Curated annotation (Swiss-Prot):
It catalyses: RNA(n+1) + phosphate = RNA(n) + a ribonucleoside 5'-diphosphate. Mg(2+) binds at D488, D494. InterPro entries: ExoRNase_PH_dom1, ExoRNase_PH_dom2, ExoRNase_PH_dom2_sf, KH_dom, KH_dom_type_1, KH_dom_type_1_sf, NA-bd_OB-fold, PNPase. It comes from Acidobacterium capsulatum (strain ATCC 51196 / DSM 11244 / BCRC 80197 / JCM 7670 / NBRC 15755 / NCIMB 13165 / 161). Signal peptide: none annotated. This is Polyribonucleotide nucleotidyltransferase. Residues 698-806 are annotated as: Disordered. It is found in: Cytoplasm.
Length: 806
């Protein structure tokens, strides 16, 4: 029978929970809708416990179907393949908050599946999926100490926003996912733009208020349609056996766990030796297997009890550090000769070799998302080989843990990357963990920051990360800075915080207990801030700022902005032009729709050559700027000068020289190189002047104007013979080839006679309508010689004036 419930969150967004219509054979199923995003989650557990295991076999799978966003999958297969990185990360976000809420000793295989059936471009289905999974478990017969609720909190214009849309998230300085119960927070996942701790804490508190509404709604639905939970028998605790074991080897085991006296590998060997000695004492009979299993279980419980009592009662850590003390730091940069940037970051017995590689825009990762196709230009990959913990293992594909740790470090660094305008590189950072004893993801953050600075990437600030732990027994608790492996394994909290001196860029928190108070959270954040400052000081001692020069092995990128209407000219028909540049210069060229062109090469000469070719192809003449051009054609009224490849301008006869030019061919010839200034640009018409360049050069050299120092005429000499005859200032009749009667030129001395007002560089005088051609051939065909009335002017003032009196 269908049942549903709706909850309205702050801001007006609604979550609708429904059950009883779909997937009715699952132990629990919930269809959850927000906006037009719809997710079905199911929960199923095997009827019987799985034999021979000492852990809870939980599997969580979150899948996003392409049809949910109205897409057909790309590629040849045309169906969904293996999980994407986003699907893996969301699966982990569902798994981490629910796993601690199953009862101890529950060993039945359990599977939670969340399927995205519909996704709009406003509501991210990942939050819907977490809530759907929680509801499915609450409705099922599977024992579960939930439900949990999940929200995303943004911070836009000083206001917190619940479940912000994709557009709002782009304007938000925080992107934080908060999951909790009625009593407290159980998981946090966050990326932020160097925000203060108080802003993050405010977002968590704000989110928890909304979480309580969601939990109440799920409880209401479970009350209507939920199944009776299975009975789970709590594992028996043999107090006598445990005390006997403690009295027998407790002191030896405590000494073996002292990692100040014994390094990690030696400590592990001593712990194993004690256990092997106890196992050897077990009689080899039919009960030996069960006895060894019982020994292993209680031996592990004793290790945990020793650790927790030392921390909460004795107030000491396994390696005898203070609660807020960070292990010894060793840093090297530039450790690899051919990489673009590298750093070796060692913290205690955790070591990360981090490299940075610079690429072009073509190297960016292309993603298909519900928002549409996107490009990701920064990637951080985390590798955890088995030798890092002294073990033997298979080197197969990347595991979920590696994907999750890499994503956390990536978020931490993303906030300080320069904009594409400042640094157009695609960036790939790889962290290879060479040794591990806790906090390897935070070592990756520190190493990544150093490697990028070593590569010359202008980060906004250095980023450091520290992992915090918590051990809580009743009202007693201890917050630990820079937790090691045992403190992570036996502690109650793993709280990773990364950021700069200005604020937090990423954090991740997982809780193994039912929840922590706001006071504990604030203390942990402050302790993490002090630890982060200590690490940043250590990093600054080695490399305080990005290197000014990039590696000689890294590609050099030059960026040029071209007009969007020039993109076609650069690419050419079928890409012929751009391919020709690439082949001639051996560079990489990337052009986007905005006209932004990135040219990349490790060869400086090839880069310069390609840049010059692109500038020539796409240059736009600027009024008032001088260019070196080539005379490509002569005409009666002037010359056509090519100032860029394929771009001609008209050098009118009146603008060729300061003196009167009778014939263009007397001054210029085809193929001549001339300096010209752009007087004006009207559409495709470019007006050029050589006279202006000559005048500027003469004035610069301090030379007089032509004719300014002519000798005085002898007294009595006829006036007409004392100076060069000038054109009459009175109206005169001038004969031209073809055309109609019109003024010689405009008031600014632009075009003169013979220039058609529709001139452009694609047209020629022999083909353009209305242009004057020898023999009287005009736009309408051959015409007789026509006469027009013009206004005579002095030399250099216009086309008519240059022709002189008739």
């Amino acid at each position: 029978m269908k049942q549903d419930v709706t909850v309205e969150l702050t801001g007006g967004k609604k979550l609708h929970f429904e059950t009883g219509r779909m997937a009715k054979q699952a132990s629990g199923a919930a269809l959850v809708t927000q906006g037009e995003s719809v997710v079905l989650a199911t929960a199923v557990a095997a009827p019987d416990p799985k034999e021979g295991i000492d852990f809870f076999p939980l599997t969580v799978d979150y899948r996003e179907y392409a049809y949910a966003g109205g897409r057909i999958p790309g590629g040849f297969i045309k169906r969904e393949g293996r999980p994407s990185e986003r699907e893996i990360l969301t699966s982990r976000q569902i798994d981490r908050p629910i796993r601690p809420l199953f009862p101890e000793g529950f060993r039945n295989e359990t599977q939670v599946i969340a399927l995205v059936f519909s996704a709009d471009k406003e509501n991210d289905p990942d939050i819907v999926g977490i809530n759907a999974a929680s509801a499915a478990l609450a409705l099922s017969d599977i024992p579960f100490a939930g439900p949990v609720g999940a929200v995303r909190v943004g911070y836009v214009n000083g206001e917190y926003v619940i479940n912000p849309s994709y557009a709002e998230r782009r304007d938000s300085s925080i992107n934080i996912t908060v999951v909790g119960t009625m009593d407290g927070i159980v998981m946090i996942e966050s990326g932020s733009a160097e925000v203060p701790e108080e802003v993050v804490l405010g977002a968590i508190d704000f989110g928890h208020t909304e979480i309580k509404k969601i939990v109440a709604a799920i409880n209401e639905l479970a009350a209507k349609a939920g199944k009776t939970k299975r009975a789970v028998t709590a594992p028996e605790f043999d107090e006598a056996y445990f005390e006997t074991l403690k009295n027998k080897i407790g002191a030896r085991l405590a000494d073996a766990l002292d990692t100040k006296a014994h390094p990690k590998t030696e400590s592990y060997a001593l712990v194993k030796q004690i256990k092997d000695e106890l196992a050897a004492e077990i009689p080899a009979d039919e009960n030996a297997g069960a006895a060894k299993k019982k020994l292993a279980h209680y031996y592990e419980l004793l290790r945990e009890k020793i650790f927790r009592e030392q921390v909460t009662k004795d107030r000491v850590r396994p390696d005898r550090r203070g609660f807020d003390e960070i292990r010894q730091i060793t840093i090297e940069v530039g450790v690899l000769p051919r990489t673009h940037g590298s750093a070796l970051f060692t913290r205690g017995e955790t070591q990360a070799l981090v490299t940075a590689t610079l690429g072009t825009n073509d190297d960016s990762q292309r993603l298909e998302t519900f928002e549409g196709e996107q490009k990701k230009r920064f990637m951080l990959h985390y590798n955890f080989p088995p030798f890092s913990v002294g073990e033997v293992g298979r080197m197969t594909g990347v595991g979920r843990r590696e994907v999750g740790h890499g994503a956390l470090a990536e978020r931490a660094i993303s906030a300080v990357l320069p904009g594409e305008d400042e640094s157009p590189y695609a960036l790939r950072v790889v962290s290879d963990i060479l040794e591990s004893n806790g906090s390897s993801s935070m070592a990756s953050v520190c190493g990544a920051s150093l490697a990028l600075m070593d590569a010359g990437i202008p980060l906004k600030g250095a980023v450091a990360g520290v992992a915090m732990g918590l051990v809580k027994e009743g009202d007693e608790y201890a917050i630990l800075t820079d937790i090691a492996g045992a403190e992570d394994h036996y502690g109650d909290m793993d709280f990773k915080v990364a950021g700069t001196r200005k604020g937090i860029t990423a954090l991740q928190m997982d809780i193994k207990i039912s929840g922590i108070t706001g006071q504990i959270m604030r203390e942990a954040m402050e302790q993490a801030r002090r630890g982060r400052m200590f690490l940043l000081d250590k990093m600054d001692e080695i490399l305080a700022a990005p290197r000014e020069e990039k590696s000689k092995h890294a590609p050099q990128i030059r960026t040029v902005q071209i007009p969007t209407d020039k993109i076609r000219d650069l690419i050419g028909p079928g890409g012929k032009t751009i391919r020709g540049i690439i082949e001639a210069t051996q560079v990489k060229i990337d052009v986007d729709d905005t006209g932004r062109v990135n040219i990349a090469s490790s060869d400086e000469e090839g880069l310069k050559k390609a840049l010059a070719m692109i500038n020539d192809l796409t240059a736009v003449p600027e009024v008032g700027k001088t260019y070196l051009g080539k005379v490509v054609r002569l005409a009666e009224f002037g010359a056509f000068v090519e100032i860029f490849p394929g771009t001609d301008g008209l050098l009118h006869i009146s603008e060729i020289a300061e003196h009167r030019v009778k014939e263009v061919k007397d001054e210029l010839h085809e193929g001549d190189q001339v300096m010209v200034k752009v007087l004006g640009v009207e559409g495709n018409r470019i007006k050029l002047s050589r006279k202006a360049v000559i005048r500027e050069q003469r004035q610069k050299l301090g030379l007089p104007e032509p004719g300014a120092e002519a000798p005085a005429a002898a007294e009595g000499q006829p006036r007409a013979e004392r100076a060069e005859r000038q054109p009459s200032s009175n109206a005169s009749t001038i004969t031209i080839e073809g055309g109609e009667d019109f003024d010689d030129f405009d008031e600014e001395g632009g075009e003169g006679e013979g220039e058609d007002e529709n001139f452009n560089r694609e047209d020629t005088p022999n083909s353009a309508p209305g242009e004057r051609r020898p023999g009287g051939a005009g736009a309408a065909g051959n015409r007789g010689r026509r006469r027009r009335r013009g206004r005579g002017r002095g030399p250099g003032q216009g086309g008519g004036g240059n022709r002189g009196p008739q």
